[in-house]
């Protein structure tokens, strides 16, 4: 969590990252409650002790597991264990299909599995069904260019929670704001963690050259990549980063990387030819000198420069932009209540996480998805519980 003195900077970084179309009231709550959110995760056995800078931030806000594991799967495991500890019933392979209402209030859901149809009555309903980054028809309705893009999202990220709430009058916001992440392995849609760059990794193009501030906002880096020859790049890292990031060890194990003991041989392993090989060697030397000097004169990068790339062996992964996060979704207030098209709260209906819109605006800052869903998930849970009790 961030200290009180860092709250204002966190708010402004998030607003600037989202191109100022975010809902400032939601961003403010997320920032103010972020420290408690991290403490709460720690209290249930899901500590995130490592901190790092991420694209577009002025400070180290990104919280990670100690061993550098991917934070998403790490938290799913920990949160699932906590749910089981509390006796929460989880119905797998069961699809929610409809939100039930009575006198305008949410009073339950309909759901179905292969074997059964269910009607589940409840005193309040929370939608935490994720975004729509795997619903290509829906995304293409806002941006036709995304119809054939690679996505990092799981197959269930189809926006069903948003659509079900819309069917009972819920409003949406920023549905056309869809984020491309710059470091996606195109063959499988696997996201190469932003932490690789936060720890000092860089991006080079097919000519062996850096082409942008590698840790600018995700949209800026993605757009810069798309302008490079072939519209792809390579992410470069060294053994120091591999030793610190468990996710990198998985990339190697799964065959995403090429590697070598020196820069020239890595360039050849990447498939670079001719002048591009020497360009790459020069790029690496220039970058290491920039880290030593504490100044990136080429592109103005100012974070993720705590250590250079000089620990052999060296690694590269060929990457390009891919769909990652849908910033738009259900319109909520700071109590995580879902709003209707007149701006009124729908009684008994709450939402949190990527199902909602307004927090991230036109671009999400790395690390803010976890902050968003923990902060507003807790708010939704507490308020839905209080509503049900009353």
Go through the PLM ranges and name each one.
Residues 1-98, 203-215, 229-231, 240-243:
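Conserved N-terminal/central alpha/beta ligand/cofactor-binding core
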Residues 64-66, 143-151, 250-254, 363-368:
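Short glycine-enriched, charge-decorated loop/helix-capping segments at active-site entrances
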Residues 67-123, 162-168, 330-331:
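Helical element adjacent to the flavin cofactor pocket in flavoenzyme catalytic cores
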Residues 98, 278-363:
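A glycine-rich dinucleotide-binding beta-alpha-beta segment and adjacent secondary-structure elements
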Residues 113, 120-185, 189, 376-379:
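Glycine-rich loop(s) and the adjacent beta-strand/alpha-helix scaffold that form part
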Residues 161-171, 273, 277, 281-284, ...:
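Internal hydrophobic alpha-helix adjacent to the cofactor/substrate pocket in enzyme cavities
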Residues 162-275:
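An anion/pyrophosphate-binding glycine-rich loop and adjacent beta-alpha core
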């Amino acid at each position: 969590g961030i200290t009180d003195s860092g709250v204002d900077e966190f708010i402004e970084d998030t607003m600037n990252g989202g191109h100022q179309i975010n809902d400032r009231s939601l961003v403010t709550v997320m920032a103010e409650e972020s420290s408690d959110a991290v403490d709460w995760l720690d209290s249930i056995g899901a500590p995130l002790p490592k901190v790092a800078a991420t694209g577009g931030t002025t400070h180290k806000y990104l919280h990670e597991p100690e061993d550098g594991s991917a934070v998403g799967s790490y938290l799913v495991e920990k949160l699932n264990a906590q749910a089981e500890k509390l006796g929460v019933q989880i119905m797998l392979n069961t699809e929610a299909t409809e939100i039930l209402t009575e006198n305008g209030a949410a009073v339950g859901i309909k759901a179905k599995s292969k074997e059964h149809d269910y009607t589940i009555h409840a005193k309040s309903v929370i939608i935490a069904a994720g975004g729509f980054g795997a619903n290509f028809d829906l995304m293409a309705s806002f941006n036709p260019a995304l119809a054939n893009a690679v996505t990092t999202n799981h197959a269930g990220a189809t926006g069903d929670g948003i659509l079900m709430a819309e069917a009972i009058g819920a409003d949406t916001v920023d549905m056309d704001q869809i984020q491309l992440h710059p470091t996606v392995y195109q063959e499988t849609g696997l996201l190469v963690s932003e932490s690789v760059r936060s720890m000092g990794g860089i991006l080079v193009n097919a000519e062996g050259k850096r082409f942008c501030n590698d840790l600018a906002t995700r949209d800026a880096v993605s757009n810069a990549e798309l302008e490079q020859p072939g519209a792809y790049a390579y992410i470069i890292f060294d053994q120091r980063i591999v030793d610190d990031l468990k996710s990198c060890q998985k990339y190697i194990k799964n065959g995403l990387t090429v590697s070598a003991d020196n820069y020239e041989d890595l360039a050849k392993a990447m498939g670079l030819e001719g002048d591009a090989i020497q360009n790459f060697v020069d790029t690496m030397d220039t970058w290491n000198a920039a880290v030593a000097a504490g100044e990136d004169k080429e592109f103005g990068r100012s974070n993720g420069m705590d250590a250079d790339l000089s620990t052999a062996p060296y690694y590269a992964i060929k990457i390009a932009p891919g769909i990652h996060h849908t910033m738009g979704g259900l319109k909520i207030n700071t109590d995580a209540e879902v709003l209707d098209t007149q701006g009124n709260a729908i009684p008994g209906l709450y939402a949190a996480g990527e199902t909602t819109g307004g927090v991230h605006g036109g671009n999400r800052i790395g690390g803010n998805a976890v902050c968003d869903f923990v902060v507003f998930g807790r708010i939704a849970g507490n308020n839905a519980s209080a509503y049900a009790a009353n």
